[in-house]
From Swiss-Prot:
One of its GO terms (molecular function) is mismatched DNA binding. It comes from the Bacteria. NCBIfam families: mutl (TIGR00585). Transmembrane segments: none annotated. Coiled coil: none annotated. Pfam families: DNA_mis_repair, HATPase_c, MutL_C. This is DNA mismatch repair protein MutL. Belongs to the DNA mismatch repair MutL/HexB family. This protein is involved in the repair of mismatches in DNA. It is required for dam-dependent methyl-directed DNA mismatch repair. May act as a 'molecular matchmaker', a protein that promotes the formation of a stable complex between two or more DNA-binding proteins in an ATP-dependent manner without itself being part of a final effector complex. SUPFAM superfamilies: ATPase domain of HSP90 chaperone/DNA topoisomerase II/histidine kinase, DNA mismatch repair protein MutL, Ribosomal protein S5 domain 2-like. Residues 517-545 are annotated as: Disordered. GO terms for cellular component: mismatch repair complex. InterPro entries: DNA_mismatch_repair_MutL (IPR020667), DNA_mismatch_S5_2-like (IPR013507), HATPase_C_sf (IPR036890), MutL/Mlh/PMS (IPR002099), MutL/Mlh/Pms-like (IPR038973), MutL_C (IPR014790), MutL_C_dimsub (IPR042120), MutL_C_regsub (IPR042121).
């Protein structure tokens, strides 16, 4: 006999369609916030979001009379018909699924409403009452996936990756993530280039080119990699349509590969992000729970290919290459005379071997990366401190508090703060490059405070050391070449910020002398033989190209 499903089973099925991980819950609530016009979003995870999940925004808010409908199935203010989907969420299932899966608490107030509303829901029980509330919406979820044995650390990692992805498509959103009360991500809405540094890493982000192109009401913006950066999978190539993160359609991927076909080896893909802004008739969204698949019109795919080709022509990259190499003219050699270095190999995962002319170079990869990061920090400090997304409280020991009036050079250059009661200050501003590292901010503030006569440059040298690639870290050819190219652009490439050498040079004439060859003898001309005890075991040598 066919029977209608009971309400509790419908709720479980709805949860299964929408919520598989904490990341899914955060995605749904984040999209609700973006649809509400939020400019600031705060995410809190307790127990990886399994014990408690909070998403708070400064968006439009939900009127008190609409709060009960917000947690009903297929209830939404966003969708009138299937041809007019202009929001990230549209199915009206997310809050209903959360209500069925956990204890749900929603506090919300539109800006024009006097006072807010509070909704408490669990299963079929729903209670609403008026309460004081700031403008915006705060959603709290308790007991999500209770008893399922989830890994809290894995859930946090998933949420962090999700938020980094959304920042690539909403780079003006001020976004904060806290796990167990500790800040894991603080992004001030500083734009796409800063979002790329966060998502791809600083070294790779430097190898991305800005893209902006439009025609006939279609527009594409983003960042795409130079030819020297590529991957064998398209897993670091991200796409959004009107702010919605979506999977790369196969047709568009073919167009991208065709645009890069003279720049990348066969089977390689670029790295980057494309943000498409399209009228509704230019794409079709697949109406599944993930909302990740789109079908794009031929005109859109052609526009993206045209945009890439125009960019490559402008950057003088549109030419056949035997292998991926950067073709943009390098800056003139430094005063030290360092020429353009060609990567050969990595030795013991710590040193890069490179050649230039008749000289073999051995480069300490950690010291080189330190120098690159240090000079980048020097340039970025000159931009001055920027407001933090949220002020950060820093506890101080009595001796540290006494140093506040000393006016250390590094402290004044990097931070703005105000006293916040005994033994605490509230950080208001910091350099933008420190915003993505909230756990490091108090430490850097105290380091600058305790300066003990050390200069700003000494502090920046220490900061450059922390994230620099370490000895023992394997680097591929593209990564090694990118590191060498970035080193060449430095003003002082020969020494790290601490004064240690970055590279050693061994000229061909030194090799000729040490191997007992005649000057200029290549591949056969032998000098007088060494005594037997000085001879090295013979081994085949690679032919010179």
């Amino acid at each position: 006999m066919i029977r209608p499903l009971p309400p509790e089973l419908r709720g479980l099925l709805a949860r299964g369609e929408v919520l598989l991980t904490v990341k899914d819950a955060v995605r749904e609530l984040l999209e609700n916030a973006l649809d509400a016009g939020a400019r600031r979003v705060r995410v809190e995870l307790w127990g990886g979001g399994l014990k408690r999940l909070v998403v708070e925004d400064d968006g439009e808010g939900i009127p008190l009379e609409d709060l009960p409908l917000a947690v009903e199935p297929y209830a939404t203010s966003k969708l009138q018909d299937l041809e007019g989907i202009r929001t990230l969420g549209f199915r009206g299932q997310a809050l209903y699924a959360l209500r069925q899966a956990a204890r749900l608490r929603i506090r919300s107030r539109p800006r024009g409403q006097l006072g807010g509303g509070l909704l408490l829901a669990e299963g079929e029980r729903v209670e609403v009452r008026p309460v004081p509330a700031p403008p915006g919406t705060r959603v709290e979820v308790e007991g999500l996936f209770l008893g399922e044995g989830r890994d809290p650390k894995g859930e946090v990692r998933g949420v962090l990756e999700l938020l980094k992805r959304y920042l690539l498509h909403h780079p003006r959103l001020a976004l904060a993530l806290f796990a167990e009360g500790e800040a894991r991500l603080l992004f001030p809405g500083a734009g796409l280039e800063e979002a790329a540094r966060l998502a791809f890493g600083r070294l790779l982000a430097k190898r991305l080119l800005p893209l902006a192109y439009g025609a006939g009401g279609l527009e594409v913006q983003g960042l795409v990699s130079r030819p020297e950066v590529s991957r064998t999978r398209p897993d670091r190539l991200f796409l959004a349509v009107n702010g919605r993160p979506v999977a790369f359609p196969e047709g568009l991927l073919r167009r991208v590969r065709r645009a890069y076909r003279e720049l990348l080896p066969e089977g390689h893909y670029p790295v980057g992000v494309l943000n498409l802004f399209l009228p509704q008739e230019a794409f079709r969204l697949r109406l599944d729970a993930r909302k990740e698949e789109v079908v794009l019109s031929e005109e859109v795919e052609a526009l993206v290919e045209e945009a890439l080709l125009a960019l490559f022509r402008r950057e003088n990259l549109a030419r056949a290459l035997p292998e991926p190499k950067p073709l943009q003219p390098l800056s003139p050699p430094t005063a030290s005379g360092l020429p353009r270095l060609r990567f050969l190999a990595q030795f013991r995962e710590s040193y890069l071997l490179a050649e230039a002319g008749d000289t073999l170079y051995v480069v300490d990869q950690h010291a080189a990366h330190e120098r690159i990061l240090y000079e980048d920090l020097l340039k970025r400090v000159a931009e001055g401190p920027k407001p933090l997304p949220r002020p950060l409280l820093v506890p101080l020991a009595p001796e540290e508090e006494a140093l506040l009036e000393a006016g250390q050079e590094a402290l004044a250059a990097l931070f703005r703060w105000e006293p916040f009661g005994p033994g605490r200050v509230r950080l208001l501003m910091a350099p933008a490059f420190l915003h993505p590292y909230p756990l490091l901010l108090p430490e850097v503030f105290k380091e600058a405070l305790r300066g003990e006569g050390r200069s700003l440059k000494a502090l920046l040298a220490r900061l450059a050391c922390l994230p620099a690639v370490k000895a023992g870290h394997p680097l591929g050819e593209a990564q090694g070449q990118a590191l060498l190219d970035a080193l060449l652009a430095c003003e002082t490439p020969w020494a790290c910020p601490h004064g240690r050498p970055v590279l050693l040079a061994l000229k061909e004439e030194d090799l000729i002398r040490r191997f007992g060859r005649r000057s200029g003898a290549r591949g056969g001309g032998e000098a007088r033989p060494r005594p037997q005890e000085e001879s090295f075991p013979e081994a085949p040598l690679p032919r010179e190209p």
